Amino acid sequence: VPLRRETFEREAVYIAIGIKPNGHKEVIDYCIAPNENIEVWTELLQSMKSRGLEQVELFLSDGVVGMKTALAKTYPQAHFQRCLVHVMRNICAKVRVEDREAIMNEFKQIHQQANKAAAVDVLHDFYAKWNKSYNHVIRNLKDIEPDLLVFYNYPKQIRASIYSTNMIESFNNVIKRKAKPKAEFPTEQSLDTFIGIQAMSYNDRYFNRIHKGFGQVQDTLESYFD
């Protein structure tokens, strides 16, 4: 988001959205920083903990380096899922244009399986097919394999919502769209106020809505918490 400090700069806005076992979702916290780094994410996680968020069952994130370690320090019992959409984008950026469509279509099959065992088979077939052409890509994918299929450990009714960060991406798009007419924010306080208003509007909008699938498995999800 554009912000004027001493010069015109683009600020990183860190946003955490959560879904309760009953399916109610809300913006839990946010902060503004000059750039994205793990230290700020660590502070945000600690802020959420200090404000009363005692337990997290599943944490979904893009590929920020160190995020899993930071999460383990604040919420050691939380499980970590890497956003498969971000992983796919990263893969497509590293392969030849003529291979992108095939690779993208095959990678999408990973999150469309009936169970984790089938997804593992699809993933390993993906390795075997593309390893010769893109050894570095497959090697990197194998390094993060433990974080790719965690969402299969949860009820099938909610898996479509927990394999990617699309929920946050949608909120980010709202912020970008509404911020665009402003060109830039004159102060950090004005930007903070703007983000706060968008967060409250989001929370008001979804206060009594149950996210798709969660109502069907509420009892199961509640059993994961102390």
Where are these regions (language model features)?
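Generic structural signal for hydrophobic core residues of well-folded globular domains
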Residues: 20, 91, 95, 178, ...
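Short, charged, low-complexity patches
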Residues: 37-41, 96, 100, 188
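Conserved, well-ordered core segments of regulatory domains
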Residues: 1-6, 11, 60, 80-91, ...
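RNase H-like nuclease fold core
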Residues: 1-60, 65, 69, 73-77, ...
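Acidic/histidine-rich catalytic cores and adjacent linkers
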Residues: 76, 109-226
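Conserved beta-strand -> loop -> alpha-helix junction used to position metal-binding or nucleic-acid-contacting
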Residues: 58-65, 70-106
